A protein has these predicted regions:
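A conserved beta-strand-loop-helix scaffold within acyl/acetyltransferase catalytic domains
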Residues: 3-54, 58-70, 116-137, 143-259
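Aromatic (often tryptophan-rich) hydrophobic motifs at membrane interfaces
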Residues: 50, 57, 80, 95-103, ...
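Active-site/acyl-donor-binding loops of N-acyltransferases
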Residues: 60, 65-67, 122-149, 279-353
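Conserved acyl-donor/pantetheine-binding loop and adjacent beta-alpha core of acyl/acetyltransferases
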Residues: 65-82
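A gly/proline- and charged-residue-enriched helix-loop-helix capping module
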Residues: 77-118
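Short catalytic-loop micro-motif centered on adjacent basic/acidic residues
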Residues: 110-112, 176, 281-285
Length: 353
């Protein structure tokens, strides 16, 4: 993480961590500890920097990634994560910084810039930007009390949570936060199986979860909450925590326990915890346009929808629907043995970027 003046005038610019702390609305993906973990796990180069914006310091997330499939690029959202620009929301100067970086890497290097909401046409034209069809980000504004927040849930969703709560108490299901390796590994196996059998894709690699969910210095940022039944991990949710915003990052449950609704229950517990910590937003992540079931699930919590645009400089847009693209081909992934599916992400994901 570095500083850059971003203009001809010399100015004192804060460090990335200082700007992150000053920015009340910052997403936990912008936390330098998280960004550094991405650099470690995926062997990419973190070029994020604080530059001079038109109205103050501007933090631009940027990663230099070189892959066999994607080529050489500078991206603000590597490997499916979406840090935002910090401080001054000057997208023109952010794009100036990113395109200058890419231009210095060779004529075929390109920029991938992901942003919530549409940018002005003048900004797009200045950089000759290509834009993809937007995906949807789902964000739940948090109230000062869980009781008030719950009123915004769909009625049947509230009733379902009450039923699950009674079942959890009756069955003696234990809901705990954990950083124990055996728990984290057990949950990771559930996640790999879910992605293999239902989503037909690889998940993020084990080294990322080991660092996020087990390293003690990451405990203020990342938390795995699990459901343990009769001594076995049967469900779990990973949330990333920021001062202003929490992010629902991953979840998985044992298919046998799916009817118990434990992911939904743990997510509800996480919402209550976020409110108690003073968070103002809870992000439910991105939703492919074709995934109606996932969108409906998020809307039951009272989420608001925000369009996320993928902008490209020196490259054609890549309209990829994670739900439907190459689905017939991906069906074969179901036949991969679980032990192999656990190891494949470490080899595949860094090459997809």
């Amino acid at each position: 993480l570095s500083q850059s003046k971003g203009g001809n005038e010399s100015t004192h610019l804060p460090a990335w961590d200082d700007l992150y702390e000053q920015t009340g609305a910052a997403c936990p993906y912008n936390n330098s500890h998280f960004l550094n973990r991405l650099e470690d796990v995926y062997r990419c180069i973190n070029r994020s920097a604080v530059i001079k914006g038109s109205n103050g310091p501007l933090g631009v997330p940027a990663f230099e990634v070189r892959t066999p499939l994607s080529g050489h690029k500078v991206t603000t959202a590597p490997f499916g994560f979406y840090p935002t620009i910090l401080g001054d929301q000057d997208h023109r100067r952010a794009l100036d910084y990113l395109t200058d970086l890419a231009a210095g890497l060779g004529r075929r290097a390109y920029v991938e810039y992901k942003v919530i909401g549409a940018l002005p046409e003048a900004c797009l034209a200045r950089h000759n930007i290509n834009v993809t069809t937007p995906t949807l980000a789902h964000v739940l504004p948090l109230e000062d009390s869980y009781k008030v927040l719950k009123r915004g849930f769909a009625k049947r969703h509230r009733e379902s949570l009450q039923t699950i709560d009674k079942r959890v108490r009756k069955d003696g299901v234990e809901i705990v936060a954990t950083r124990v390796e055996t728990d984290v590994r057990a949950w990771f196996r559930l996640l790999v199986r879910l992605y293999r059998d239902k989503h037909l894709m690889v998940t993020q690699p084990w080294p990322l979860f080991r660092r996020l969910c087990m390293d003690e210095d990451m405990s203020p940022l990342a938390e795995l909450m699990i459901a343990r039944k009769q001594g076995h991990v049967v469900a779990g949710v990973v949330v990333l925590k920021g001062r202003h915003e929490w992010v629902y990052a991953w979840s998985a449950q044992d298919p046998v326990a799916e009817k118990d609704g434990l992911v939904k229950y743990i997510l509800d517990q996480s919402l209550q915890k976020a409110i108690s910590f003073g968070a103002k937003r809870f992000s439910f992540g991105l939703t492919p346009p074709s995934h109606k079931g996932l969108r409906d699930f998020k809307m039951k919590w009272g989420c608001h929808e925000e369009p996320v645009y993928h902008l490209y400089w020196n490259a054609r847009p890549k309209n990829v629907d994670l739900q439907m693209s190459a689905r017939r081909l991906r069906m074969a992934y179901r036949f991969v043995p679980l032990w192999l599916a656990e190891r494949l992400p470490s080899f595949i994901v860094p090459r997809l970027a």
